[in-house]
């Protein structure tokens, strides 16, 4: 599909899709009606899954499902994770408490619309009354989709997908209990109401977003992290890194837009707020102390435990405040991968791990956003270990960008988009793929033009 046809399709969808503040976009032709008060936003709300953390806590999952009244559970995982001790521990716990289950292990690393629909179809063919997700973000997001579409058997796939690609329908059906047990320290999906996937038709990432998608319970067991390969730890860790940085530097919730006429219409991503800041600060300090050790010392339970906790903490923070440009730019990067295959991954297809696609633009992004809130950027740099005494506000972006580059270099991250197979000729297509992500890019503290987006991609061709 040509770029022109893609943009025409997007504009057509926007003009005929949802008009609520949670999914509104500047480039639609029709204005929202009846859902905005015209009053400036004055409130934020905190919503998160119940979280249980502790080494070995996975043994409790059978009792949890029994207490939820589950009779037949869909255990969602992938074929690699299925071989790990974490799944055996869970299966033993289910058996010990008399819980019947079926295993779905066909999750795709970096899910697509087709892979999510495959899982949803599997769930629809069975009468599951609960879901258990054991794996990384791909597994947890797949479980969320399977839960949603098996609970609403009449729904078509695009009904719940975010505008402008989908219809952005609000979830009104009752979902089944979902317990999430992350085995990687990255996405924070165990606490968020977001499921992300590649929409192959447009070579772009999008997702389904609703507070009702949040898992019922997140079981955070640091023992699972000891099986993370080095590169998985590095790439997933940079997702935590950017979740914390982006939520901490997002637009203030009072500046996001007008207040909704009904509190149920307040968007999932609301902008930074005093509560989300607590989680982001904790995550950034924890990253400073533990990230590099967690990458290169796989047996260091303390470092890996702390990164596992930071992942959840950052997830709670960004799950309410939102993310912005690093994630917005990442979706067309991963959606337009050609031949890149990362070391340490066993996937049979080309892929750019999510954390890598996010951090690759981070130095350029934070140099761009810093003029809008330099104090925030200086504080973030300080939390990550930079010396900020005497640094001028005008240098805040450079300092934070250099701090990010330092972590990237120490972690052995690829040096920019060129090393992922991109060139300047790809920039127009990457910009086009970013435009549908306005749901999150509008949360950046500084507004962007298409020319700004193009320059961010150009500046990310070489990271350091």
Swiss-Prot record:
Gene Ontology biological process terms, A to Z: glutamate catabolic process via 2-hydroxyglutarate
GO CC annotation terms, alphabetical: mitochondrion
Primary location group: mitochondrion
Enzyme Commission no: 1.1.99.24
Broad EC category: oxidoreductase
Alphabetized UniProt keyword annotations: Mitochondrion, Oxidoreductase, Transit peptide
Top-level taxon: Eukaryota
Recorded catalytic activity of this chain's protein: (S)-3-hydroxybutanoate + 2-oxoglutarate = (R)-2-hydroxyglutarate + acetoacetate; 4-hydroxybutanoate + 2-oxoglutarate = (R)-2-hydroxyglutarate + succinate semialdehyde
Oxidoreductase as UniProt keyword: yes
Protein name: Probable hydroxyacid-oxoacid transhydrogenase, mitochondrial
Family: Belongs to the iron-containing alcohol dehydrogenase family. Hydroxyacid-oxoacid transhydrogenase subfamily.
Pfam families on file: ADH_Fe_C (PF25137), Fe-ADH (PF00465)
Function: Catalyzes the cofactor-independent reversible oxidation of gamma-hydroxybutyrate (GHB) to succinic semialdehyde (SSA) coupled to reduction of 2-ketoglutarate (2-KG) to D-2-hydroxyglutarate (D-2-HG). L-3-hydroxybutyrate (L-3-OHB) is also a substrate for HOT when using 2-KG as hydrogen acceptor, resulting in the formation of D-2-HG.
InterPro entries assigned to the protein according to its UniProt record, in alphabetical order: ADH_Fe/GldA (IPR001670), ADH_Fe_C (IPR056798), Alcohol_dehydrogenase_Fe (IPR039697), HOT (IPR042157)
Record localization: Mitochondrion
Organism of derivation: Drosophila pseudoobscura pseudoobscura (Fruit fly)
GO molecular function, one term: alcohol dehydrogenase (NAD+) activity
